[in-house]
From Swiss-Prot:
It comes from the Bacteria. InterPro entries: STY0301-like. This is Uncharacterized 16.3 kDa protein in trpG 5'region.
Amino acid sequence: MLRTLILLTLLITATAGPALANEVRCPASLTVQAQPEAPGGWSPYPAKDQHAFAGVTLVEGDRAAQMAAPAPAALEPDRSLRRGRSEIRQWDFPAARRDNVFLICRYAGTQATLAIDLPRTVRRCQITEETDARGMVLDKPATAPQFLCR
């Protein structure tokens, strides 16, 4: 019985590992160390600020070069679908893509971002965001955007 349980655990771990390794998600929040610049006579006191996930940008090309540019060239989604009070945007990637694609995770209330190169095994990224009655994505949604690449 114990041997069967151990083998079953190993099998589940072996089959679940690669699927999870191919998934890319933005962290739900970002902690930023704020260092104020104080005018003469004032004393600055740094603080850590927490910022909620707000959205993504997908970019093709060299991450270092694109992030050094004033505005990285964002990839347009391949599909966009409005469903009730949400918009779903989807990017599809061919199996044999030559160029690097990276993900920029954006956070509310800060210009600080996180970026990561997408593994070449990723075939699709999708984000679902809350919209108003006219279909415009909300700046301050009641629920955080849902994002996943796999």
